[in-house]
């Protein structure tokens, strides 16, 4: 079984979605079940409703799952596993207070050395502390694993101390809950971000202590860097939020296409998730950080907009008139996102705001003169744009730039865009709706 294990503590990050997509693809390729595990044991950081938001995003991406579980439902199991380790002398109670440990951390910082917990501290405050934590005994050997992307990774014994499994309130730490659940659900491969590399040896030690003889394969994805700063994209970066990208009008299929493409060797530029299942391979992923490029994402989104069928296009733009499909297709050529397309069609159909767009009083006056001339015309009486244009020029007594710029604004709501002769047939059939001024 493969899994995706998000925490409901904020917006879904593009790095997390990338991991979800890759786990889903490999699960499909290997004909294995796919598990979604909501890691909700950190009650203080959980945000209500974020779990459902994550699930909705996965559905939008075309990702389905065979099983959905909440980690908090397994707490009794986690405690049972901790008790097992205590009985087998693989774990121990630690009575050292948080204040004592904080002083030791500060001392290590001042001495410019890494902080390492010492097992001899375990009973120092046993008489005063009646709520101990449970720690796994530190290993006396190196921990190594063969990462599917990073290759051989090794941690020396002095890099790993006796870390906490259960907190004072008997709640499991992230690493303990994660390792226990991965065993419980028989997870065979975990694809996740490289920020989890330091967690992996701890989880391996926990699983070994619990008697696992079937090691999990790990694949740690390189981080995604911001295209401008070159730094890791954090949750503070708008574009790192999948929700933000969707709200900006990026199609789910384009987002998935892009996240599969970056840092990867792909056989074609534009593809669907189902197509990627046919050829995706972890071996083709680069070990170097990927750079996020919003301009290229917009390019891919533009290509996917062109691929939308008529029914989907009308639904996504909230246009009910099928006669406007051709116009939508023309506007797509100038749009990178669904939001841009919606804005174009809205400007086209809504009353025109010449106050907002006029350059000076003379320009506003020309707009009004031309507007009155156009109102007297029956657009459907003209066989083509050329004959319509000549009559509009004659009636308004305007020509050149004084004619064309006001004409474009009055007919499309925009000072630039698709050539007017191309969209004139759609203007003809909707001219009474189009030719209106904003009060």
From Swiss-Prot:
InterPro entries: aa-tRNA-synth_I_cd-bd, aa-tRNA-synth_I_codon-bd_sub2, aa-tRNA-synth_I_CS, aa_tRNA-synth_I_cd-bd_sf, Glu-tRNA-ligase_bac/mito, Glu/Gln-tRNA-synth, Glu/Gln-tRNA-synth_Ib_cat-dom, GluQ/Sye. One of its GO terms (molecular function) is ATP binding. Signal peptide: none annotated. Gene3D superfamilies: 1.10.10.350, HUPs. Its EC number is 6.1.1.17. It catalyses: tRNA(Glu) + L-glutamate + ATP = L-glutamyl-tRNA(Glu) + AMP + diphosphate. HAMAP family: Glu_tRNA_synth_type1. This is Glutamate--tRNA ligase 2.
């Amino acid at each position: 079984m493969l899994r995706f294990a998000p925490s409901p503590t904020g917006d879904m990050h593009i790095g997390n979605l990338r991991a979800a997509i890759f786990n889903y693809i490999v699960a499909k390729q290997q004909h294995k079940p796919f598990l979604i595990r909501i890691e909700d044991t950190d009650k203080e950081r959980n945000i209500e409703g974020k779990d459902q938001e994550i699930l909705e995003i996965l559905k939008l991406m075309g990702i389905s799952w065979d099983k959905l579980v909440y980690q908090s439902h397994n707490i009794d199991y986690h405690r049972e596993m901790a008790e097992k380790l205590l009985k087998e002398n693989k774990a121990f109670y630690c009575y050292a207070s948080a204040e004592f440990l904080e002083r030791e951390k500060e001392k290590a910082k001042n001495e410019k050395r890494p902080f390492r917990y010492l097992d001899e501290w375990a009973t120092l405050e046993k008489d005063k502390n009646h709520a101990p934590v449970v720690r796994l005994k530190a290993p006396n050997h190196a921990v190594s694993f063969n990462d599917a992307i990073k290759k051989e990774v090794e941690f020396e014994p002095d890099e790993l101390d006796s870390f906490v499994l259960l907190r004072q309130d008997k709640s499991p730490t992230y690493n303990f809950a994660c390792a226990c659940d991965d065993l419980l659900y028989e997870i065979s491969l975990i694809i996740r971000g490289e920020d989890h590399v330091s967690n992996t040896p701890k989880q391996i030690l926990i699983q070994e202590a619990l008697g696992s003889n079937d090691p999990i394969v790990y694949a740690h994805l390189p981080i995604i860097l911001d295209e401008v700063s070159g730094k890791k994209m954090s949750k503070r970066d708008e574009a790192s939020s999948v929700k933000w990208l969707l709200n900006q009008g990026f199609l789910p299929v384009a987002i998935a296409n892009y996240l599969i493409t970056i840092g990867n060797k792909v056989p074609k530029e534009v593809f669907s998730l189902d197509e990627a299942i046919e050829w995706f391979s972890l071996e083709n992923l680069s070990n170097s950080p990927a750079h996020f490029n919003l301009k290229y994402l917009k390019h891919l989104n533009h290509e996917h907009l062109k691929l939308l069928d008529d029914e989907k296009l009308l639904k996504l733009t909230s246009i009910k008139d099928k006669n406007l499909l051709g116009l939508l297709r023309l506007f797509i050529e100038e749009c990178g996102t669904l939001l841009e397309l919606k804005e174009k069609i809205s400007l086209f159909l809504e009353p025109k705001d010449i106050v907002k767009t006029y350059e000076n009083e003379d320009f506003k006056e020309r707009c009004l003169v031309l507007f009155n001339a156009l109102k007297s015309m029956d657009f459907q009486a003209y066989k083509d744009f050329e004959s319509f244009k000549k009559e509009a020029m004659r009636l308004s007594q305007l020509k050149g730039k004084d004619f064309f710029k006001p004409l474009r604004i009055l007919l499309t709501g925009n000072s630039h865009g698709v050539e007017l002769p191309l969209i004139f047939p759609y203007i003809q059939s909707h001219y009474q709706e189009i030719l209106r001024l904003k009060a």
